């Protein structure tokens, strides 16, 4: 049983527990909130039992995730301490959150800088990128949100309801933030957003311009560019490929196709064709033959016939992505797709998911087998399991090294095994 929710006055120093789920942007915004609080002398604690208040940064992309979020709300509210529900549910499902935890405070994604004011711990500084003193010691990488929202109107997506249209943070603010991380000797920097290729379309700049500004920072570091949509990547393709040529940019492209059938893409309102997706991949691969390609596919979208799914299978066989994130369609209340005709029964969507997953694992094993015997430079990024260290190559391949190595150093490794998700290397 949950304890009675109390609304105590906060002490002068607030102890705050954070819990985040979902996309990289959610984790990035959770870190920014922590930095905002810690820079004002407040304490970030590792458990809700130690906290004066808890902040839950929510994701609601599919119904399974939503159920998990509701459970976590109950558990955290059961501590009998103030709860802040942030992230997408705080914007897209406010009524549901209020019914679930009536005493919780809601902090939508675009309002994250107001965390300080919300906790009575100081004054918020607005709804744009904020220059703050940061304690970087707790993190081995940097997550830098570059924008809110997206340019699309996908019929299945509840995230757009939560985050709205594109609102880009200023180039100078992003550069200053990245420079701060680099000066703190963080070498693995992730630029994130719902659609990074949409960056700047609301303010007369662009993702390539941002990349050139960020890679102009002095230092030895790597930039991973986050997910981008074919819709917004295609108009800037040549300029984007040129910006990717910097040795400071990981040769990694996350480009969700969602379906290999043009009819399904039209029903999704993705606003591009399969041929556009293939053109983007061809351009990047021509410039960077070893680039790592990641894509996303939704199976079981309303109206997806066996023939439509077969075209998705054919596309994956044809373009051979290094990674395919497979998701079964999840009807989200309030989205057009939730009430479309031709809903695919669960068992059929599950079977399609399994079939596509088998294909993607086979392709990944075949690609990674081709690395065995090669010698690669690896940037160490995080500790692994059982005394190992994880690292990334310039094409963002994950390599498992056999010993504990300092994080942020370069190592040379000979690849001895290629697995579905990573490579195994030995130091030389």
Predicted regions and their residues:
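Conserved SAM/AdoMet-binding glycine-rich loop
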Residues: 83-84, 92-93, 97, 183-306
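Short, solvent-exposed loop/turn segments at secondary-structure boundaries
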Residues: 65-67, 165-170, 200-205, 266-270, ...
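Short flexible coil/turn linkers enriched for glycine and charged/polar residues
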Residues: 137-140, 150-152, 259, 289-291, ...
């Amino acid at each position: 049983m949950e304890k009675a929710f109390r609304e105590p006055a906060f002490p002068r120093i607030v102890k705050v527990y954070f819990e985040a789920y979902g996309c990289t942007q959610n984790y990035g915004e959770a870190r920014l909130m922590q930095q905002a609080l810690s820079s004002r002398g407040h304490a970030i604690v590792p458990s809700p039992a130690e906290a004066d208040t808890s902040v839950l940064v929510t994701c609601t992309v599919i119904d399974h995730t939503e159920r998990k979020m509701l459970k976590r709300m109950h558990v955290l509210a059961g501590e009998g301490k103030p709860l802040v529900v942030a992230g997408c549910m705080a914007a897209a499902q406010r009524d549901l959150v209020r019914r679930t935890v009536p005493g919780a405070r809601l902090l939508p994604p675009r309002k994250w800088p107001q965390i300080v004011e919300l906790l009575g711990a100081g004054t918020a500084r607005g709804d744009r990128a904020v220059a703050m003193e940061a304690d970087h010691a707790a993190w081995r990488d940097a997550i830098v949100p570059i924008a809110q929202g997206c340019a699309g109107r996908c019929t299945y997506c509840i995230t757009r309801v939560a985050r709205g249209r594109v609102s880009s943070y200023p180039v100078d603010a992003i550069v200053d933030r990245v420079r701060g991380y680099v000066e703190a000797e963080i070498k693995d920097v992730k630029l994130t957003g719902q659609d990074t290729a949409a960056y700047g379309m609301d303010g007369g700049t662009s993702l390539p311009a941002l990349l050139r500004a960020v890679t102009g920072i002095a230092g030895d570091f790597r930039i991973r560019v986050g997910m981008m949509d074919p819709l917004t990547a295609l108009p800037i393709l040549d300029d984007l490929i040129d910006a990717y040529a910097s040795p400071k940019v990981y040769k990694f492209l996350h480009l969700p196709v969602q379906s290999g059938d043009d009819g399904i893409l039209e029903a999704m309102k993705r606003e591009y064709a399969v041929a556009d997706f293939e053109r983007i991949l061809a351009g990047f691969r021509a410039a960077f033959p070893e680039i790592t390609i990641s894509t996303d596919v939704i199976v079981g979208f309303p109206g997806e016939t066996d023939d439509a799914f077969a075209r998705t299978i054919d596309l994956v066989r044809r373009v051979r992505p290094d990674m395919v994130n497979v998701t079964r369609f999840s009807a989200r209340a309030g989205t057009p797709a939730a009430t479309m005709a031709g809903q695919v029964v669960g068992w059929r969507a599950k079977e399609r998911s399994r079939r596509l997953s088998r294909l993607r694992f086979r392709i990944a094993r075949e690609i990674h087998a081709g690395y065995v015997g090669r010698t690669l430079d690896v940037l160490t990024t995080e500790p692994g399991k059982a005394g190992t260290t994880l690292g990334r190559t310039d094409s963002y391949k994950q390599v498992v090294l056999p010993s504990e190595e300092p994080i942020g150093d370069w190592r040379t490794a000979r690849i001895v095994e290629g697995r579905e998700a990573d490579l195994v290397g030995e130091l030389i």
